[in-house]
Swiss-Prot record:
It comes from Geobacillus kaustophilus (strain HTA426). Its cofactor is [4Fe-4S] cluster. Its main location: membrane. This is NADH-quinone oxidoreductase subunit B. It is a peripheral membrane protein. Pfam families: Oxidored_q6 (PF01058). NCBIfam families: nuoB_fam, PRK06411.1. Its EC number is 7.1.1.-. GO terms for biological process: aerobic respiration; electron transport coupled proton transport.
Length: 170
C-alpha cells in the first residue's frame, strides 16, 4: 500500500516509511489486551506461595503490566495454582463465569494441571481443565516464579497471535 505524501523529500519519505506502522484494529486490541493482563488469583496450596512471590520486589510482575485483582469482575486471567477438590469445583466455575470476556486461564503446577501427588484421591479433580478451559499449563511442583512469568509471556504471545490470525490458538 503506497501512501502519497505531498511536500516530503526522498530522505524524509524513507524516514516516514521506517516509522509508520500499519495494523488492523483487532491486532491493536490484541496488543493492548496482552500488555495489560489483570490476573485473578485462585491459590489453593504451595503453588500459591510461588505465585505470591511474583508480586514481590524481586520478580515484580507489575513491570509487565499485570496487576493482581481481588474481584473476578475486574480480572481477565485466572491463575489456578494448587489442588482443586470436587467440592471447590463449582466455586471455581462460578468465578470463571463472573469474569468478563475475553478471559483466559493459567493452570500452575502439577496439582492444577493433572491432580499432582493427590491424583488417586477420591476428592481431587484430575486437572482444572475438566472445569474451565485452560489456555496455558505451567508444569512443576511447585513451579518457580520465573516459570509463572514465562507462562504469562506465553499467554501474551497467544493473545497477540489470536488477534493477528482471527483464529483460536491451542
Amino acid at each position: 500500500m503506497d501512501v502519497k505524501w505531498e511536500g516530503f523529500s526522498g530522505v524524509e519519505m524513507e524516514e516516514v516509511k521506517r516509522n509508520v506502522f500499519l495494523t488492523t484494529l483487532e491486532q491493536l486490541k490484541g496488543w493492548a489486551r496482552s500488555s495489560s493482563l489483570w490476573p485473578l488469583t485462585f491459590g489453593l496450596a504451595c503453588c500459591a506461595i510461588e505465585m505470591m512471590a511474583v508480586g514481590g520486589a524481586h520478580y515484580d510482575l507489575d513491570r509487565f503490566g499485570s496487576f493482581f485483582r481481588a474481584s473476578p469482575r475486574q480480572a481477565d486471567v485466572m491463575i489456578v495454582s494448587g489442588t482443586v477438590t470436587k467440592k471447590m469445583a463449582p466455586l471455581l466455575r462460578r468465578l470463571y463465569d463472573q469474569m468478563p470476556e475475553p478471559k483466559w486461564v493459567i493452570a500452575m503446577g502439577s496439582c492444577a494441571t493433572a491432580g499432582g501427588p493427590y491424583v488417586k484421591s477420591y476428592s481431587v479433580v484430575k486437572g482444572v481443565d475438566q472445569i474451565v478451559p485452560v489456555d496455558v499449563y505451567i508444569p512443576g511442583c511447585p513451579p518457580n516464579p520465573a516459570a509463572l512469568i514465562y507462562g504469562i509471556h506465553k499467554l501474551k504471545e497467544k493473545i497477540r497471535l489470536e488477534a493477528k490470525t482471527g483464529k483460536k490458538v491451542l
